Amino acid sequence: MFRFMRDVEPEDPMFLMDPFAIHRQHMSRMLSGGFGYSPFLSITDGNMPGTRPASRRMQQAGAVSPFGMLGMSGGFMDMFGMMNDMIGNMEHMTAGGNCQTFSSSTVISYSNTGDGAPKVYQETSEMRSAPGGIRETRRTVRDSDSGLEQMSIGHHIRDRAHILQRSRNHRTGDQEERQDYINLDESEAAAFDDEWRRETSRFRQQRPLEFRRLESSGAGGRRAEGPPRLAIQGPEDSPSRQSRRYDW
């Protein structure tokens, strides 16, 4: 019933039987340079060092497979192959030293058994990178079942990193802050943060994200004023599309 996802033209009478044909066709042309340009040239010098052509697996026609849409030797398996090729090209462009990248992934789990409020788990991971081994990582977790809300932000320069993690439980009111250092001593944290800000200022004329520390006030504490701003801007940071941030 279903075929391998392969190059077909809209006038092909079997075209409508392949629900992913248009998507696969566009992806194949992008990866093989069929459009004659790259969406990443605007942030490079116009060259595409290290990019790879689409694999033969993407361009070859396949055979009829009744299990194709179940992800067995066709269908989604071919989509995974195309995505792997795209990720590989992204890695090669980043290694070229003249490219900024942004990636984001989100997982959401929803459960409603009918006896109480629905249970929702959401986890989002983001990464921004710039030449020179500069990266900013961000991970947020929300779990309605346990009441946990957690956010961690990491600043990386090659193999060194300073990671700040904050969590709170909106049911119990408990809050926790933790800082991790990779190939750094705690005494070097301030100098590392200054270096990270200097490096990122070359790519964006805007105050980079700063770690806001809780200031002790007796048994409790208060947080610094002002929302964080990311040094390496991603698509969701545009004025027309502001994502929700956890500002604790």
Swiss-Prot record:
Compartments where located: Cytoplasm; Nucleus
Cellular component, GO annotation: cytoplasm; glutamatergic synapse; membrane; nucleus
InterPro entries for the chain: Myeloid_leukemia_factor
Effect of residue 80 to C: In a colorectal cancer sample; somatic mutation
Phosphoserine modifications at: 217, 238, 240
Region listing for Disordered, in residue ranges: 130-149, 165-186, 208-248
UniProt keywords, alphabetically: Cytoplasm, Nucleus, Phosphoprotein
Family the entry assigns: Belongs to the MLF family.
Protein name, entry field: Myeloid leukemia factor 2
Organism of derivation: Homo sapiens (Human)
